Design a protein with these regions (language model features):
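Charge-rich, well-structured scaffold segments of protease-associated domains
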Residues: 7, 18, 62-221, 230, ...
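A generic "binding-loop/recognition-motif" signal
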Residues: 12, 194, 268-269
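Short, Gly/Pro- and small/polar-rich lid/capping loops
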Residues: 1-10
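Residue-level marker for the onset of beta-strands and adjacent loop->beta junctions
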Residues: 1-2, 25, 74
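Short beta-strand-initiation
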Residues: 1, 224-228, 271
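Active/ligand-binding-proximal structured segments within catalytic/core domains
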Residues: 11, 18-69, 143, 180, ...
Length: 355
C-alpha cells in the first residue's frame, strides 16, 4: 500500500494511493459536512447544494461540466450523507488535471443561478416523492426520526417539499461559506497517480477555498431518544425495523457491534436468516445492521413480511436478540470476522473504493 498524505499551508489535506498497475484514477473531495450541519431552517440544503454544484460556474455551463468529463470517457458525481458530502470523478490517468479542474471549479466558483435553482428544486421534489413511494426508504426515515427525535441527525437528508421550495441562492452560499472550508476538506486520489504532481494541481486549483468559516459550523451533540412509529399503507408487505443505540465509529466497541450484526443477520448462515426465513418462512428479507456516526450509532434489524406474519415475526426477532445476549459461539465470531474481512478486502479492489 503506497499511501501518501500532505497537509497544505491552507489547511487542506491531500491523500493519494499510487496503484501503478492501473490506467485510471478515482479522485474526489470529501467535506466533513452533511445534513447534520444544517440549521432548523436549512433542512435539505446540504443535498440541494450538492445538486446545484453541477449547474454551472463562471467558467462552465451545466452542460459543459458534463460534456468535458464525458468527452474523455470519465464520469463525475456527488453524494450527501448525514455527516459528509463528497464530489468525485473517475478518469484515465492522463485526464487527472481536467478532473481536478472541474471539481475545483464546481466547489469554488459555482454561480447558483436562480433559474437553475428552481429547476433543480423540482428535481428534488420528485426525488422526495420517489422516496416516499419506496417502503423501505420510508421505514428507515421514520426510524431515524424516532431514534433522534427533533434533531438534525434524525432528519431525512432530502429535506421536505416546504423547506426545499423555500431556499434561495443566498442561503446556499451561506451554508457553503460556513461549512466548505479547507480545515474540513480532504482531496483524495487512488490509481495511477503521482503524489507530488497531484498535490501541486490541487494546491493551484483549490487556492481560493476559504480557510475559516463565515460562522461557526452547526452540529449539536446527538441524544438518542427512541420511540415507536407506525404508518398504515395499502401495500403487500409490511416493513419492520427494530433497533437501539449503537456505537460511534471511533469507539472500540464499534467493531464488536459490527460482528454482532453479522452474526445476527449478515448472511444466509446468520441466526435471523436461518430462524426467521429458513425454519419458519416468515419473511423473504431479514438482516441486521450497525451504522456509526461521529458521536453515536444505530444497531437495527430490518425485515419485510406479509401482514399476517407480523405477529409471529416480531417476537422471534426479539427472542434472537435475547439469545445473542446470553450465548455466542466462537465459531460464529470466527465466521463473522472472516465475512467482514473478506467484504472489506474485496471492496478495496477498485480505485474508486480505495479513494
Amino acid at each position: 500500500m503506497n499511501v501518501e498524505c500532505t497537509r497544505l499551508a491552507s489547511g487542506l489535506t491531500v491523500v493519494t494511493e499510487n496503484m501503478p498497475h492501473l490506467e485510471s484514477v478515482a479522485l474526489g473531495t470529501w467535506i466533513k459536512s452533511g445534513s447534520r450541519n444544517e440549521t432548523e431552517a436549512e433542512h435539505g440544503i446540504a443535498h440541494l447544494l450538492e445538486h446545484m454544484a453541477f449547474k454551472g460556474t463562471n467558467k462552465r455551463t451545466a452542460r459543459q461540466i458534463a460534456e468535458e468529463i464525458e468527452n474523455v470517457g470519465g464520469e463525475v458525481n456527488a453524494a450527501t450523507s448525514t455527516e459528509t458530502t463528497s464530489y468525485y470523478a473517475r478518469v484515465l490517468k492522463d485526464n487527472v488535471p481536467l478532473a481536478v479542474d472541474i471539481l475545483a471549479d464546481i466547489l469554488t466558483d459555482s454561480v447558483f443561478d436562480e433559474e437553475e435553482l428552481e429547476r433543480e428544486k423540482h428535481v428534488i421534489l420528485q426525488e422526495i416523492g420517489a422516496a416516499d413511494d419506496t417502503p423501505d426508504d420510508v421505514v428507515f426515515d421514520r426510524f431515524s426520526e424516532e431514534a433522534y427525535r427533533g434533531q438534525t441527525i434524525g432528519r431525512s437528508i432530502l429535506g421536505t417539499p416546504e423547506t426545499v421550495q423555500s431556499f434561495s441562492s443566498d442561503q446556499i452560499r451561506a451554508y457553503l461559506s460556513r461549512n466548505y472550508t479547507t480545515d474540513r476538506m480532504f482531496v483524495v486520489a487512488a490509481g495511477k497517480v503521482d503524489h507530488d504532481e497531484f498535490v501541486k494541481q490541487v494546491e493551484e486549483r483549490f487556492a481560493s477555498l476559504p480557510t475559516t468559516p463565515s460562522a461557526t459550523p452547526v452540529m449539536d451533540a446527538a441524544r438518542y431518544t427512541g420511540g415507536e412509529s407506525r404508518e398504515e399503507r395499502d401495500l403487500m408487505d409490511t416493513q419492520v425495523l427494530l433497533g437501539f443505540e449503537g456505537k460511534a465509529y471511533h469507539m472500540r466497541d464499534f467493531y464488536c457491534s459490527q460482528i454482532l450484526a453479522n452474526i445476527l443477520g449478515g448472511g444466509m448462515s446468520s441466526r435471523l436468516f436461518q430462524e426467521v426465513r429458513e425454519i419458519r418462512g416468515l419473511c423473504y428479507s431479514v438482516y441486521a445492521f450497525h451504522w456509526g456516526f461521529s458521536d453515536t450509532g444505530i444497531f437495527g434489524i430490518h425485515a419485510a413480511t406479509g401482514g399476517e406474519d407480523l405477529p409471529q415475526l416480531v417476537p422471534v426477532i426479539i427472542d434472537e436478540l435475547r439469545k445473542s445476549s446470553e450465548v455466542i459461539h466462537q465459531q460464529e465470531i470466527d465466521r463473522a470476522r472472516a465475512q467482514i474481512r473478506a467484504q472489506l478486502l474485496m471492496g478495496q479492489e477498485s480505485p474508486a473504493a480505495r479513494a
